[in-house]
Amino acid sequence: MLNRLESLTQRVGGSNELIDQWLHARKELLVSYCTVIGIKPQKGKHTPLNEKALENFCHNLVDYLSSGHFHIYDRIIKQVEGASSPKMALTTKVYPALKNNTQTIMAFHDRYTNIEIDDDSCTEFQQALSDIGEALDARFRLEDQLIQWAAESWQAAKPVIQAGQVK
């Protein structure tokens, strides 16, 4: 996921401040996810995992989801498409998929926020981390479609400079 993010950032980075901020927030989320998945339980019975790392990940997760749903998606769609765009049908497919994905991710958040992970629940938690990684990957692929559409739209809207003339 980090490699794909780096590639996307190289392709579209700098084209729009909103996209740059969004990609930066995604990177922060991925770093916090990587921190959580790297945590292993101690051998002692009932030794909790690093709750601070889990708390940080859950905080970044909610911030990322909220900014997408309440700020970024609508702005991108309005800037890129308008109500009569031929791509509107595509976003009517992507947005519901993102909404369903959000429900899956929030179920993880609700389940594992404010819970102590001990040896008895460690296996279940590790599976949940794997599942949330897959959900994030699916989400990022959907969001990448929106970002790509936005980048293409903004690129097409820029004037073409050829031999000192603006066309």
UniProtKB/Swiss-Prot annotation:
Q: Does the keyword Transcription apply?
A: yes
- Identify the Pfam families for this entry: Rsd_AlgQ
**Location of the protein in the cell:** Cytoplasm
**Might you name a Gene Ontology BP term for this protein?**
regulation of DNA-templated transcription
**Record's GO cellular component terms:** cytoplasm
Q: Which UniProt keywords apply?
A: Cytoplasm, Transcription, Transcription regulation
The answer to whether keyword Transmembrane helix applies is no
Q: Which family does it belong to?
A: Belongs to the Rsd/AlgQ family.
What role does this protein play? Binds RpoD and negatively regulates RpoD-mediated transcription activation by preventing the interaction between the primary sigma factor RpoD with the catalytic core of the RNA polymerase and with promoter DNA. May be involved in replacement of the RNA polymerase sigma subunit from RpoD to RpoS during the transition from exponential growth to the stationary phase.
Q: How does it assemble?
A: Interacts with RpoD.
Its name, as the record gives it, is Regulator of sigma D
